[in-house]
Amino acid sequence: MEAALSHKISGADKFQLLLDRHIRLNQPTGNIIQLSIEVKGRIELEELRKVVNANSFLTQLNSLQVTDNTLSIPRWINGEEQYPVSLTEFPYKSAKVSEGLIDIALFQDVTNTKVLILVHHVLADNMGIQQIARLIDGTIKPPLLPLTEGVKDTTPLIQQLVHTLKATLLVFRKTPKHMAKLVAAEVVTKTFILDFDDKQTILIEENAAKNGARLSRSAFYLAAVSMALKQTIFAGNGDSFFLPVPQNQRLRGNDQLAMGNHLSFLFYNIPFNKLNNLSEATAFITAQMVEQIKDQSPKSYSYLLKTFRFLPLWLYDFFFKMPTKGAVCSFLFSDVGETLPDMKTFMGKEIVEVLNLPPNPCPPHITFVMMKHAGTLKLIMTYNSKAISEDEISKFEIALDTLLIE
C-alpha cells in the first residue's frame, strides 16, 4: 500500500471530484457508486464485520484522503486517522454513513442476503468497485496496483498539448445550441431496474445486430434509450441530446485491482431528428463513435483531464460548464459490460444477482447503467423524482421495452 500513498490523482479522478462538488450543492451524500450483491443464504453482519475488520488493507484504503492545494495536482495520501470500514444493516440513514470512502450495508430476507457496497467515486470506477468486492471476499489479495496511471507516460509535452487542444475543440463542436436538459430545485433519488431474462437478452442482442450495431452493442442500447427519452421524459424539451459516455482505459487482461478511475469519454450530440427509428439512430451514434476512435479523441480527452488536474475546482468547474452554458449534459449513460468472470460466489455463498447501481443522478437528474450478469442484461436507472414523474417513468419503461425487444 505504501507505493500508493503519494500518487497524483488521475484526470478522471479530478472529474469525479467536480461531480461530487455539484451533487453536494443539492444533497450531502456526494458522488457515490454502489454495488449490490445478492447471495443465497444468510450472511450475518458480525460474520462480515469480522472478515472486513481483519483486512488491514481495506482500512487503509477506506482512510485515504485527497489533498486539495491551490494550483497543484491533488494527491492521494494516507489519512491521519484510520477508519475501519463502516458496516450497518438496512434501513441505513443515508447512502454514505461514515468518515471513510467505503461503506457496507446488509439486508436479510427469509432466504437470501443482499450486500450493498458503497464507495466514493473518486476512489473507484465500476470495475474498481467489483474488485473491492473481490478484495472483501478474499478472491484477490493485496498489495494492489496504484491509485493512478500505472504506466509512465513518455508522450512528448508538445503532443500532449496538441491532444488537449483537440479535446477542447471537440467538446465545443459537439455541444448543441438547444440541449435537452432537466431542471429541478429539489432532489429525491429513486432507482428503477429493467431486468431481462435469458430469452429477452438473446432477442435484444439479435435486434442490436439487425439494427447495425455490429461494432458495439452500446450504440444500439444508447439509441434505444435516447429514442425512449425523446418520446416520453424529454418530449418537447430541446432539440438534441448531449452526453459523455465513459470508455474503459484499463489494460486488457489486467485482472489486478487498480483503484481510481481509469476512464476517458466519447461525446455524443444526438439531434432529435436522428431518432426516428432504431437503425438510423444506431448508425448515427456508431458513426460518431468510429470517428472519435479513429481521431484518438478518448486519448486526447484523457490529456485534457490530466492537464486540468492542477486547476482549483471553481476554475475547473467554469471550463467544463462553459460549452454547455451551465448544464453538464442531458443525461448520463454507461455500458459497463459483463461483471467479472469470477463473481460467482461471495463469502462462500452463491451469487444470485449483481447490480452496478448508477451514481447519484444530480446532475443531470437521470443516469443509466447497462450491464450483464450471468448472461442476462439489466438496465438500471437512477433519477430525481422531483424532475421526473412516476407517469413519465411508466411511459419510458413501455417505450424502451418495445424498442429493445420488438
Which residues are covered by each model-predicted region?
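Non-catalytic N-terminal regions of enzymes
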Residues: 1-157, 218-241, 345-406
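Helical lid/core segments from catalytic subdomains that handle acyl or acyl-like groups
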Residues: 45-47, 52, 261-337
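Low-complexity, serine/threonine/proline-enriched polar segments
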Residues: 155-165, 287, 333
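Flexible, P/S/T/G-rich "lid" or insertion loops adjacent to the active sites of thioester-utilizing
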Residues: 159-215
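Long, internal scaffold/assembly segments composed of regular secondary structure
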Residues: 190-283
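Short proline/glycine-enriched turn/loop segments at secondary-structure junctions
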Residues: 234, 254, 320-323, 357-358
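Active-site proximal loops enriched in glycine and acidic residues that flank catalytic Cys/His/Asp
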Residues: 247, 335, 381-385
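Short, charged/polar surface micro-motifs in flexible loops or helix N-caps
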Residues: 251, 337-340
